[in-house]
Amino acid sequence: MMDAWPRCLERLEAEFPPEDVHTWLKPLQAEDRGDSIVLYAPNAFIVDQVRERYLPRIRELLAYFAGNGEVALAVGSRPRAPEPAPAPVAATIAPQAAPIAPFAGNLDSHYTFANFVEGRSNQLGLAAAIQAAQKPGDRAHNPLLLYGSTGLGKTHLMFAAGNALRQAKPAAKVMYLRSEQFFSAMIRALQDKAMDQFKRQFQQIDALLIDDIQFFAGKDRTQEEFFHTFNALFDGRQQIILTCDRYPREVEGLEPRLKSRLAWGLSVAIDPPDFETRAAIVLAKARERGAEIPDDVAFLIAKKMRSNVRDLEGALNTLVARANFTGRSITVEFAQETLRDLLRAQQQAIGIPNIQKTVADYYGLQMKDLLSKRRTRSLARPRQVAMALAKELTEHSLPEIGDAFAGRDHTTVLHACRQIRTLMEADGKLREDWEKLIRKLSE
């Protein structure tokens, strides 16, 4: 029967999304009972989800591979096989305490600080995550909230902090959940009248990591339970690390008291990576895959794919897969040919009209005013921001950008770009506006 479980798991990996397999199925430990298998899960959340979503398929596969589909689920760790008694020795050896079995909290061990590519857009988030791992529960960064658009590395930093905490303290109980998982587990607990058990899960952990808390918006009971969970962990000096797709105060449907709690610790924006960081990410990901990527190809991808890390990885995966399939070397020409449709879609997603509309909406302006010849400060500054964003995020030339702004001269565009760059060094509000607009345009 034990030989059947790895084969069963391999089939499940092919049938279900990778994140689901990693979250719910990989933590399971199998014990052979002769005529059946017991699958041990690290907590009741996983037991409930496996029973509800995967158990029928697991039984089918085990029946196919082992001729018997009898499966039981339990919370805990697989019992260790008894060791033979040691032969007697003349000297008495002092007994040693058995090591504590590590807590399987759904952490992906692949994500570490070592393989996180640091850049200007994420260096504060990286420093904060390292501090949270080194000094868990410290009020200076508890809770630690990382916010920004999808695919910028928030979850990587969250996993890295959890893995570093576990490395420093192997017995630490670190639990990672997506917000949907917290919600689903709470609903199941309500249905089963098992809320006491649901709450006890969080009393036993050292750190709680929850992804995408914007999902809690509008779910009053979920927010209430998370509010009480948050208070208990915070009072117990247990580390809380959260991610959100925007600054929590901007999330409609989150209760004011929860927004207030989230502001107690440290909130850090993770912005889209700049060109140098994007190129470094492409080269680093290529090394991880054992692929040979020339620098000029990495620069091409970094120049064209501006939105997020996930898109960079997608472009790289496409390139490497086609190179392996065709046996061709990866060159700039090969990359342009392979990624042609992807790069075209990227350019269309962030065009000058989209930038103009986003900037006008952000500053509460009419489009006709943004493009007008009027030079009042309330119009001139947003107009310069829009021009600078067009230069930063598109491949259009200065004359083309000027034409899109009611036929302005290319020198006007150049002046706007230089002016905004200079002002952002001293004007924190303008820098904040710029970063928010970048995030909006990258969504």
Curated annotation (Swiss-Prot):
Region of interest (Domain I, interacts with DnaA modulators), ranges: 1-76
Region (Domain IV, binds dsDNA): 324-443
Listed SMART domains: AAA (SM00382), Bac_DnaA_C (SM00760)
InterPro entries documented for this protein: AAA+_ATPase (IPR003593), Chromosome_initiator_DnaA (IPR001957), Chromosome_initiator_DnaA-like (IPR020591), Chromosome_initiator_DnaA_CS (IPR018312), DnaA_C (IPR013159), DnaA_dom (IPR013317), DnaA_N_dom (IPR024633), DnaA_N_sf (IPR038454)
Location of this chain's protein in the cell: Cytoplasm
Region (Domain III, AAA+ region): 106-323
Residues annotated as binding ATP: 151, 153-155
Gene Ontology molecular function: ATP binding; ATP hydrolysis activity; DNA replication origin binding; lipid binding
GO biological process, any: DNA replication initiation
The entry's keywords: ATP-binding, Cytoplasm, DNA replication, DNA-binding, Lipid-binding, Nucleotide-binding
A Pfam family it matches: DnaA_N
GO cellular component annotations of the record: cytoplasm; plasma membrane
Region of interest: Domain II: 76-105
NCBIfam families the UniProt entry points to: DnaA
General function of this protein: Plays an essential role in the initiation and regulation of chromosomal replication. ATP-DnaA binds to the origin of replication (oriC) to initiate formation of the DNA replication initiation complex once per cell cycle. Binds the DnaA box (a 9 base pair repeat at the origin) and separates the double-stranded (ds)DNA. Forms a right-handed helical filament on oriC DNA; dsDNA binds to the exterior of the filament while single-stranded (ss)DNA is stabiized in the filament's interior.
UniProt domain comment: Domain I is involved in oligomerization and binding regulators, domain II is flexibile and of varying length in different bacteria, domain III forms the AAA+ region, while domain IV binds dsDNA.
HAMAP family per the UniProt record, alphabetical: DnaA_bact (MF_00377)
Subunit structure, as described in the record: Oligomerizes as a right-handed, spiral filament on DNA at oriC.
Family classification: Belongs to the DnaA family.
Protein name: Chromosomal replication initiator protein DnaA
Origin species: Xanthomonas oryzae pv. oryzae (strain KACC10331 / KXO85)
Lineage of producing organism: Bacteria, Pseudomonadati, Pseudomonadota, Gammaproteobacteria, Lysobacterales
